[in-house]
Amino acid sequence: MAHLLGSQACMDSLRKDLTDLQGTIVDVFSRAGPVRFPSWKFPDRVACDLDMVALLEHYDHVPGDPEFTQLSHAVLLELVIDRLLLLLQSCASYLENLSVEQMMPPARAAGPCMSVGLTVRRFWSNLLRLGLLYQQAVPQKRANQGEISITKPTAKGEPARSPECMTAKFIKPPSPVPGLPLICQGLQSIPVRVSLRSPGGTSEKTKSVYSQTVETALVPCDACTSVQGSLWEVGKVVISLCQSQNLPSSLGQFQKLVKDSLGLKPLPAATVGHWAAEQSKDLTRLNKHVGALTQLVGPLRAQLEDAEGQKDGLRKQVSKLEQALQQEQGQRQRQTEEAERTLAKCEHDRHQLLTETCDLKTKVAVLEGDLKQQQKSIQAMEAKAQQLEEEGERRAAAERQVQQLEEQVQLLAGRLDGASQQIRWASTELDKEKARVDSMVRHQESLQAKQRTLLQQLDCLDQEREELRGSLDEAEAQRSELEEQLQSLQSDREQEQCQLQAQQELLQSLQQEKQDLEQVTTDLQLTISELRQQLEELKERERLLVAFPDLHQPEEAQIQSSSNVTQDMERQVQANAIRIQVLQEENKRLQSMLTKIREVAQQGGLKMVPQGQLWSPPYKGIQGATPPAQAQSAFSGLTGRRQSPGSRTSSTGRTHPGGLRTSPSRQPGGLPSKFSLGDGSHSASCTQNPIRALARLRRKLSPNRQAGSTYQPQERPT
């Protein structure tokens, strides 16, 4: 058998066998329903879901590849085993359904993976069970036939009928109902039990009778044929849609299998259900594809609309550019016309110069004849001629320098005018030289003594003529260069105009941004000034709170506690540090004040006032009352706190209902606490009034300070 491996005839035979096996399996599935067992060839897939068409197309005979052909032959053999095993499993399921009198079992999950031997044993056991049932039913069938023939004899001329025909006559399959599955053609044999009771009613016998099948049916159901015809047409449309969209079609593969197995026969119910499932798969695939296409088409439409808008804008820009180009072309035409006019003028001037040079040549020939006669006198004058040549060279160098300076001074736009001016200047020089030549001829004719000067002037004229020729050629070359420079300048001017427009737009935007930034800076400066004022006020308030803690609310009420205890303690530590710093400064001031008071007391300038003169008469009879605001202000001046009236009125102090203020530093008798004035004792401070003395001492020590703010009584708000 090894030499047959890869043979095309063997592979074709196996392919035909696989096609027949698959058709038989589909027929069994249409009667017993699909069985879901793992495939023997592909254990990870269900056997009934294998795509046999794709497998047969893939594993085929390839003439140029013997290895793949042998592999395909082996795979086809394995597929034959797989299909035979699936056929045995489906037949076993069909036999089980016959034994339990149920043709279409309910849907069930995939079964376990079974070997070939186990599947064959199961099939044989089911077949034996069916044989036993049939053997048990045969004697009952014979007994029933005998009882029917005894109890109900046949009429004359009427043929004897079997019990199967009698039961099939009265027991008919149900009529097809629209909307239900088409099972009228899928049932090949439905067992029906008919119970016949004996006259005595003591025994009950049953018998299996088979109903009408597809092969024995005389007329097929019209509704089924019409529905299946429309189903075929819809399937063709769905397959064509999938092919047009380059999508795989599950229904197409299933349709090929149905055509190969059933042809044009009516489809059974299970096949119709499988058909509907495959068709729904294709429809869902088409729906997803259409959804993806709509998602792609949406942004493309938006991009198309944007492109059309941009196209309109570009058309407008092109029209504007065409208008600008036409204007520029008109300007260039006008400029070329002007250049042609100037060129014609230059040509005319050149012709005039040529005619004049011809006249000069004739005159020079005449003069040369005269010069031949006067050669003897010329030789004597050669030294002077050399000097004149040097002067001529200097003159030419000076003229060249003048020309260079003129070229540097003139602008690029006026070089053409400069060239024309040079040509005119050359013509005027020629006129002058003509006059000089005429005068020289007249002088030569009239005065021979001036012959030497004429010869010198003649040499100068020759040199100037040559220089004029060279200058004329240079002027023509300069004119061509100036034309090229003019064109380049025009292009540069256009570019500079474009750059100027862009810079102007940029300048406008920068100015707008500058104005916005100036507005923002002014707003920020205002906010900064306000914040600085608030900061100064808060600093002043903090200093007052630290300096006069007794005049304000308790510290426990002022501290706003947060959820973080450590943060509150840190804030309290910072406040205490600030308070300690301020108190240290106050201690220094008080120490300096005490030193000054001691110095004044030692000098004898401090006077003691009796205690009886301290208080005014209205306050003598009140016990526990505080002294007037003047004494309180003097006492506050003793501490060295030089506050303005506004800052002192801003502090909050406690006031009795009677209008008299009390301080926690006061004694119960209404007198201030003890003060150590220099070396004075406690008895002296009690008997004398030190407040007025301190006030007088303060006035003596600070005469320039305003005393009104110290003695003016102030009312603190309650």
Curated annotation (Swiss-Prot):
It comes from Mus musculus (Mouse). This is Coiled-coil domain-containing protein 157. Transmembrane segments: none annotated. InterPro entries: CCDC157 (IPR029681). Residues 300-603 form a coiled coil. Residues 469-490, 617-690 are annotated as: Disordered. The keyword Cytoplasm does not apply. Residues 639-659 have a biased composition (Low complexity). Residues 469-482 have a biased composition (Basic and acidic residues). Keywords: Coiled coil. PANTHER family: COILED-COIL DOMAIN-CONTAINING PROTEIN 157 (PTHR43696:SF9).
